[in-house]
Each structure stands twice: as structure tokens, then as C-alpha cells.
């Protein structure tokens, strides 16, 4: 029995190939290093090429065209891909340290409406706009930025407040306070492939590993 188990493990270790993974910056920073490390311990001969998209639709296009074998994106997917939902990423309000309402739980709606607001660039802010609409808030948008790290730095420097998915604000390199909105809103993150029936073995192994890893670690 042991020899059979060992033979299977040897075969597993021999698995090789190249997987092209498309992602967006918060997943690339928060999840991918840990996912790739744990996957590499199981399959040391599978290589990766990372593509970071500025917009979700760019990631979808890469998967459709075959430039990427799989990709992280938010639901709903518009291009008829095979998707595996992974994680409900809760939206959070971020404010500078020392903000007078930093300790409020939940954060007051009227403050969101009156303070200078730093908005994530359109195209990636669908859930944020929907959440503001549902709260009946029309924020005073003073700045619009494309990069989540830029927004974190601006909030940290007291230029305004923002509403961003938790994965973007988790482990912020800049000091900020993360606050709970008056209601819960989410961005749904998934991993997608063009056709789950036509995956290379190495891509299938990686997608399965991602699903397991996020189920175990996604909420930490």
C-alpha cells in the first residue's frame, strides 16, 4: 500500500506545465503569493505566468482570447465563462487615523454624504456605486483614482474617506481605520475559465487548489 501511495505522490510531483493566471491587484497582493506557495509545494514543476488586469473586463477578455488560462474576476461575468464563486468580499469604509467618527459602529451615513470622498475609477466601482445608491448617499467626490493603493495613501493623508472591498484595505501599507458601513454590501469574487471541459491538467489542478485554499483561508 505504501509503495502505491508513494508512486502516486511521485506522479503528482512530476506534473508539469505552464498556467497563465490573470488577476486584479488586491487578489494578486493578498491571496496569490500564499496560493502559489502552497500549490508549489504540491506541484513543484508547474510554472506560472501572472497577468494583472487594470479592469475586470480586461481579465475576462484575456480568458476568452486564451491569453490567460484562468482568471480571478468579480461576478457577474459578462462573457459566458465557466465561473467558480470563491468569496464574498465585504465593502468597508476607510477613514484617516484620528477621524472623529473612526470609532462609530456602524459608520454614520450622513458622514459618508458630507465628507470629501475618494472614488475608485468607474468600471471597477459597480458594487460601490450600488451600495451608495442603496444607502441613498450621493457622496461629495473630490478625487477619483484608479489604484486601490493610491486611495489608501490619500485617505491615510487625510484627503478624504472611501468605500472599498475588504481585500483592498486588508494589510494596508498606510495607517487607516477600517469601519463598518450601516449595512453589509459585498463584491463577489470568482475564478473563471473559458471552458471547464477543455482545461489542461495543470490549470485544472490549480483551479481546484484555489477553490480549496479560499474556502479555508479566504476569510482570515
Task: Label every PLM stretch briefly.
Residues 1-20, 40-41, 79-84, 103, ...:
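Short helix-loop hinge/linker segments at domain boundaries
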Residues 12-13, 80-117, 121, 201:
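Flexible hinge/capping segments at coil-to-helix
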Residues 16-78, 145:
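Central regulatory/effector-binding core of bacterial HTH transcription factors
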Residues 18-22, 71, 94, 118, ...:
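Short, well-ordered beta-strand segments
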Residues 31, 177-220:
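A late-sequence structural motif
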Residues 43, 79-85, 89-90, 104, ...:
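Beta-alpha-beta core module
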Residues 54-59, 64-67, 123-177:
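Hydrophobic hinge/microswitch elements
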Residues 101, 115-136, 199-207, 217-218:
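Secondary-structure junction motif
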